[in-house]
Swiss-Prot record:
PANTHER family: DEAD-BOX ATP-DEPENDENT RNA HELICASE 47, MITOCHONDRIAL, DEAD-BOX ATP-DEPENDENT RNA HELICASE CSHA. It comes from Bacillus cereus (strain ATCC 14579 / DSM 31 / CCUG 7414 / JCM 2152 / NBRC 15305 / NCIMB 9373 / NCTC 2599 / NRRL B-3711). Belongs to the DEAD box helicase family. CshA subfamily. Disruption phenotype: Longer lag phase and slight reduction in growth rate between 20 and 45 degrees Celsius, no growth at 10 degrees Celsius. At 15 degrees Celsius the unusually long cells form large aggregates and are curved at the pole, with incompletely divided, thickened internal membranes. Decreased growth in the presence of H(2)O(2), diamide and at acidic and basic pH. One of its GO terms (molecular function) is ATP binding. Its EC number is 3.6.4.13. InterPro entries: DEAD/DEAH_box_helicase_dom, DEAD_box_RNA_helicases, DEAD_helicase_CshA, Helicase_ATP-bd, Helicase_C-like, P-loop_NTPase, RNA-helicase_DEAD-box_CS, RNA_helicase_DEAD_Q_motif. This is DEAD-box ATP-dependent RNA helicase CshA.
Amino acid sequence: MTTFRELGLSDSLLQSVESMGFEEATPIQAETIPHALQGKDIIGQAQTGTGKTAAFGLPLLDKVDTHKESVQGIVIAPTRELAIQVGEELYKIGKHKRVRILPIYGGQDINRQIRALKKHPHIIVGTPGRILDHINRKTLRLQNVETVVLDEADEMLNMGFIEDIEAILTDVPETHQTLLFSATMPDPIRRIAERFMTEPQHIKVKAKEVTMPNIQQFYLEVQEKKKFDVLTRLLDIQSPELAIVFGRTKRRVDELSEALNLRGYAAEGIHGDLTQAKRMSVLRKFKEGSIEVLVATDVAARGLDISGVTHVYNFDIPQDPESYVHRIGRTGRAGKKGIAMLFVTPRESGQLKNIERTTKRKMDRMDAPTLDEALEGQQRLIAEKLQSTIENENLAYYKRIAEEMLEENDSVTVVAAALKMMTKEPDTTPIALTSEPPVVSRGGGSKKRGGNGGGYRDGNRNRSRDGRGGGDGRNRDRNRDGRNRDGNRDRNRDGNRDRNRDGGSRGRRGEGQGRPGSSNGRGERKHHSRPQA
C-alpha cells in the first residue's frame, strides 16, 4: 500500500489527512494524485466509496495559492447533496492550508451566494445549472481557474447537464487542468474528454476493487405485501445503529417513513419534493442519531457520506444494478463493516441476477424471519448487552434491590421479567403501503448508457417533448417546457430563466411512478439457510 507521505503532498495537506485518521491511500488515490500533481489531465473510472473525492481534492487543494483572492478551481457535481458533501470534505482536507471553499447549488438563496462569492473563495463546488447562472450574472468569474473537476460525469450526462458543462468549460482558460471522474464512459463523455482535455491519463479501478468487501450482502425472497413486516422484524433482530431504507418512489418513501413511526421506530424520509431546508434538517438529525432510520429515494441519497451507517435495506429492488452499488456504498465505509439487505419479490429474480453480474459477487440468501425469531433475536441482543454491563459496569448501587428481588423470586424469573421489559412487543398498528410494480429484468444485464442517458431508473422514462432522454429518473428535473434541471435553474418557454429564490425542485418525475420493463423469464435460485446477521 502507498502512504500519503509518499505521494509528494504539501505538509499542510498531510497534516489535515493525518488528523482525519488516514495514512494509506486507496488505489484510485495512489494512481491519480502523482499524475494530477504534475498537472496532467486525468480520466478516473471509479465507483462511489473508493476515495475519489480525496483523489481529486488533494491535488486540487495542493495547487491553490491562498495569497490570491480569486477562484482557482471548480468542482462540478450532479446534485446539491453531492456538492455539499464534496465541499465539506474539501474543507476538512484544506483546513490547515486555509483554503476557502464555497458550495453553490439550487435550493439556497442566490443573493446569499452572491454575497459569499464577493469574499473571494478559492474553490467553488456546485451543480451545473447554478454555476452557469452565476457565470451569466457575472457574479462568478473563471478567468483565473487552473483546475476543473467533473465529478460523476456519467450521472450529469443522464440528468441532461452536458450542454451546461460544455458552456462552463468554454468559459475557463484553455490552459486549465481537467480531472474527470465517471463510473462509466459513454460516448458523450468521451467527446468531452477529446474536446477539452489534453492527452489525459486514464486511470481505472478494477472491478474487483469496487465490489465492497467490507459489506455483507444478503437477499430475501419476499412477497410485496409482506415486505413491511419483514423489515420491522429485521430491524428488531439486527438493531442497527444507523440504517438507510431505500424506496423506489417518493410515495413509497412517504408511506414507509410514516408506517415505521406508527410502529415505534424513529424514522424520517427524504426525496426530491422536500425543500432543501427540510432535507438538510432530516440529514442533520440522522447524523446526530436522533433518528435511527433514514428512508430515501436514489436521487435524494446521491452523494451522502454519513459515517456510522451499519445497515442498508433495499426495500424496493433498484431499477438498475448501478443504483444498487451506489445504495449499498452508504455503509461499509472507511474500513468499517456493513450489512446490505435486498428484498426480492418472486418476479424480480432476473433483476437480482443482473445485480450479481454487475457486482461480480453472488449474494447469500437469508430467510425472512418469523415473528418468534424476531422476538428471540431481540432477547439475545438484550442478553448480550446485559452481559456486557455485568462485565464492564459498576453495579454496587443496584445490588441491594436485586438481592431483595431474589429473596422473593427465583433468578430465572427475575431475568425473564427484565428481558420482557426490554423487548419490543409485536405491534399490530394498521399500516397502509401502496404496492409498487415489480422491476422485471429486461435481459442481458446492465447496459452502458449512450448519449441520451438511456435506461430507466426510479421507474420513469422521463422524456421531454423533443424526445431527448432524461435517462435514469435521477432527473433532468424538467417538465414539458424544459424547467428545473437541478432544482435551481428554471427555464420558461422562450428560454429565459425564472430565478426562483428557493431554487426548489418542482416535482422530480424521475422518482415518480414505477414502470417496469418486459420479462425475460424467471431464474430459480438455490435455497440456503439464513446466516446470522
